[in-house]
């Protein structure tokens, strides 16, 4: 019996050994199929893998974990085809053609729910779903669903570690989960037909042309929408004011006319906007008087306002009275030759023009009375009238001012440089008789005539009252810093009378001593020196420097004669080229200061031209 049992056991062992060999062959075949499937998958084609080697231990089949070289870059995703390069759509052109049915403008992607994948397809074609869900139940349901999905995925991972499934999806899931490839669905919204991806949440019927990356939707606002929010400021660079003819010829077009039209439009546009918002405009409005423009062809302009008209009449009356007084005194004391000399001297004085005219402005048509091409100036209006209030400006010479459009018919962009009428504050104008005295001394041979001429010239200089260009009529006419100079000027008549008596005595002595030639010449020279000292040489006829410029509204200290450091109380620069015109001080040639009075002889006043390099200061009130 024992032997029979041993034989039976041996037979059973042989059967088992035979069955074991058969099982090993079957398992080897299965392993070959496993490797073939992996080689066919896109994962094996793209990256080299280390395939697991199944081991048999106690009839339990186990596998080693998958390892790959891509474990350091978990963001890469496999695909069956090459993806088309993404085209970033311009966010300022509005939505694409298939999205016009939705509201405009598009909402950026950060406003969408991250877990709702339908927002990524087609912008706002969201199929009856809300952009912002404030319902707690919906949020909880979404979270629960996500948690359930995660739990299921973890269970599947554990099962895959224990049991090898030979389908492609389980292989990919095992590979993905073991290498931490957890890709969210909202990171990529493009169409993909890869069978190894979870593509249930993607719309496969969507056109590829309308595919957009959700990250590019952060600035999807139209340019029209932005234009309503952002202010638009049109500025003109000051460097564009260089209107050289060479530059214009190189460009091939008339850039000066374009610049003129632009500035003209800017002035009118800001005028309209300022009127609409009831703001004071910084641009003057000068009404053109067509009749005066036809009568005056010499480019003599005046700023016309209510008080300037009164000041014009007052100054003209003062000039007429002064001329009448001079003529009466000259007729009583002078001969015919002396009268001729006095007439010549009177003709040399500067007078303002009696006619008024407005600032001309370039017009598109011939009718200058149209409202579009004319302006009106008013009292207390900001702009130029604020600087020319209560002051006479006569014979403004615009010949040296560059105007755009050719000639003097255009708007003057720049500051005026020449004023023929002296408008310096408290400026005295006397007849400069130096040339006349020299001519009389050289031409006349009679000693008595020479003496009479000199005496008459002294009378004309002493009796002529100063013409004051009055800027502030309500303020004291004689400031403290000029009292001494005014007192000297007021005592000129008595001083000159004494000089006349001395001259007559000298003439009598010369006639009695029969030394007419020598002594009279000496006396003439002395008289000429007296005349030179009595006459303030504000206007130099030899050099034709008869241009005195305006002072600032408030006297300030100025060290440079070419530039003013005054700050305007209005919100604009004095040197703005768009102001018509800017009469800020450019150059003041002959100011009067007490420091220029000769301390030795109180009868004489040193001419300012004798010390041009000496600095001066304005008088403060």
From Swiss-Prot:
Origin superkingdom: Eukaryota
Ranges in coiled-coil conformation: none
Biased composition (Polar residues): 348-357
Compositional bias annotation for Low complexity: 1-10, 63-79, 137-182, 309-347, 431-459, 496-539, 597-613
Region (Disordered): 1-29, 63-100, 135-194, 307-374, 430-471, 492-539, 594-614
Protein name: Putative uncharacterized protein DDB_G0286333
């Amino acid at each position: 019996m024992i032997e029979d049992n041993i034989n039976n056991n041996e037979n059973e062992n042989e059967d088992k050994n035979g069955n074991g060999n058969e099982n090993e062959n079957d398992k080897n075949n299965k392993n070959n199929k496993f490797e073939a499937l992996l080689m066919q998958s896109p994962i094996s084609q793209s990256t080299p893998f280390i395939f697991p080697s199944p081991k048999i231990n106690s009839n339990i089949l186990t596998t080693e974990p998958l390892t790959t070289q891509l474990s350091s870059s978990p963001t890469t995703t496999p695909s069956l085809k090459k993806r088309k390069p993404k085209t970033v759509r311009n966010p300022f052109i509005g939505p694409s053609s298939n999205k016009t049915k939705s509201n405009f403008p598009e909402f950026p992607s950060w406003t969408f729910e991250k877990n709702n994948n339908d927002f990524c397809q087609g912008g706002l074609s969201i199929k009856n779903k809300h952009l912002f869900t404030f319902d707690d139940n919906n949020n909880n349901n979404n979270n629960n669903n996500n948690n359930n999905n995660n739990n299921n995925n973890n269970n599947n991972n554990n099962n895959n570690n224990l049991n090898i499934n030979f389908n492609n999806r389980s292989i990919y899931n095992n590979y993905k989960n073991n290498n931490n490839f957890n890709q969210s669905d909202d990171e990529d919204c493009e169409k993909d037909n890869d069978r190894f991806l979870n593509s249930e949440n993607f719309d496969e019927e969507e056109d590829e042309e309308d595919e957009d990356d959700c990250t590019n939707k952060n600035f999807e606002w139209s340019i029209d929408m932005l234009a309503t929010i952002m202010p638009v400021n049109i500025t003109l660079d000051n460097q564009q004011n260089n209107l050289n003819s060479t530059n214009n010829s190189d460009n091939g077009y008339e850039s000066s006319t374009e610049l003129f039209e632009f500035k003209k439009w800017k002035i009118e546009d800001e005028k309209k906007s300022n009127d609409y918002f009831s703001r004071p405009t910084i641009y003057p409005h000068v009404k053109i008087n067509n009749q005066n423009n036809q009568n005056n062809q010499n480019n003599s302009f005046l700023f016309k306002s209510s008080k300037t008209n009164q000041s014009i009449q007052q100054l003209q009356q003062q000039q007429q009275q002064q001329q009448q007084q001079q003529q009466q005194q000259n007729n009583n004391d002078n001969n015919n030759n002396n009268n001729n000399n006095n007439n010549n001297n009177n003709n040399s004085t500067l007078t303002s023009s009696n006619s008024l005219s407005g600032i001309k402005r370039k017009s598109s048509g011939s009718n200058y009375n149209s409202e579009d091409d004319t302006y009106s100036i008013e009292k207390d209006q900001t702009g130029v009238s604020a600087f020319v209030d209560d002051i006479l400006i006569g014979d403004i010479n615009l010949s040296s001012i560059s105007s755009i459009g050719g000639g003097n018919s255009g708007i003057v962009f720049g500051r005026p440089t020449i004023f023929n009428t002296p408008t310096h504050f408290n400026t005295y104008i006397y007849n400069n008789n130096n040339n006349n005295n020299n001519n009389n001394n050289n031409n006349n041979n009679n000693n008595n005539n020479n003496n009479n001429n000199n005496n008459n010239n002294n009378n004309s200089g002493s009796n002529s009252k100063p013409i004051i260009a009055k800027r502030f009529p309500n303020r004291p006419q004689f400031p403290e810093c000029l009292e001494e100079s005014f007192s000297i000027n007021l005592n000129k008549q008595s001083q000159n009378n004494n000089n006349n008596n001395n001259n007559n005595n000298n003439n009598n002595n010369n006639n009695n001593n029969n030394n007419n030639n020598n002594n009279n010449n000496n006396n003439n020279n002395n008289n000429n020196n007296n005349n030179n000292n009595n006459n303030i040489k504000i206007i130099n006829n030899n050099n034709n420097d008869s241009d005195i410029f305006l002072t600032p509204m408030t006297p300030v200290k100025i060290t440079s004669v070419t530039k003013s450091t005054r700050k305007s109380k209005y919100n604009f620069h004095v040197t703005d080229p768009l102001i018509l015109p800017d009469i800020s001080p450019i150059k003041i040639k002959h100011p009067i200061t007490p420091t220029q009075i000769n301390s030795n002889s109180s009868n004489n006043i040193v001419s300012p031209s004798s010390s041009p390099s000496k600095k001066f200061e304005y008088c403060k009130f």
